[in-house]
Amino acid sequence: MMKKLIYQTALIAYVNAICFRNFRPTCTKISEQYNRNIIYDSENSYVSHDRLQRLLVFEGKWNTYIQKHYSCLLKLRESSSKKKTYLIIDDTVIAKPYSKELDSLSWIFSPSDRQYLYGINVVFVIWTDGNTRFPIGFRIWNKHDKKTKIDLAMELLNEAKKTYKTKPSYVLMDSFYPAAKLLKLIRKFRWQWIAKIKSNRCINGTQAQEFFRYRYGNHIGKLSENIKARIVKDNDNYWATSDLSLKPSDVKQYYRNRQIIEEFHKILKSELRLEGCSSRESLAQMNHIYFVLMAFCQLELFRITRNIGTIYKVRAVLFDCVVPKNLNWKLNIMAFA
């Protein structure tokens, strides 16, 4: 019980320091920020550098922790909102240009950065209704592992279905992910999907760039392995969807929601320092990702319950606050007006 309490205090310190400050999250700096304004005879105990280091290499069930404490975001919005909801698949690179000893490091092309980066490739699936965002989970891709990023995305979709019982209007993905086996899994779940596809993807046995002879196009055909889809062309862009009832304009409109996961990645990196863990332990790197996701959920829950526009607006006020000693933040709402 005492050990659990010690790790709980360290976790609160780690998550709150990430939320309330903008620095590289080393154990020393987190300890310094959290321990400020603590009185010796108060109920709050000091969190040492060593305790935070032990937390980073502790094999906790962090995914279960996120589900228990933050899935209310998903459930409340999904049950009350009449908006369309989406599951979005994407991956990002956690740049580690100076690391050498981590097993999962490799050179990966980052489309958002338009260059090859040396780092950790992470596959995310998030749920959103266009406003609220909730991370279903993540998987780290290892080039030495037999699992592909498609396989990892399928694991996360299984988690969304079985653990969170989600019923998305559409699953959104870029042109890397609509492999036949992933699309079949979505069909098995009785979900619909919308994806960007490459110009060399075959439609009825002919590449899309040759199938459509004009600038714009719209056709119901079959992709590989007899997967029926509506394919839409707009200049050099191609989309496909399993929902044959959609108009071409609707396909493009709904697909724009995929941009939400790009902003999600931006917040994790620029605001919550996803790339900031300097540990050489693979477990510590993975735990840091979990703690950053907890910080994101904490900010998102605060933003939604207080009806604040963006996480950036929340953070601008938090910078001037003392790092709290619990996760039940009691802040002056007028500061966010």
What residue spans do the PLM features occupy?
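Gly/serine-rich nucleotide phosphate-binding loop at the start of the catalytic core
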Residues: 1-66
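Active-site-proximal, Lys/Arg-enriched surface segment
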Residues: 17, 54-132
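Residue-level signal for inorganic ion chemistry
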Residues: 30, 125, 294
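Alpha-helix termini
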Residues: 38-41, 75-79, 161-163
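Single, function-defining residue in the core of a domain
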Residues: 2-7, 11-16, 21-26, 69, ...
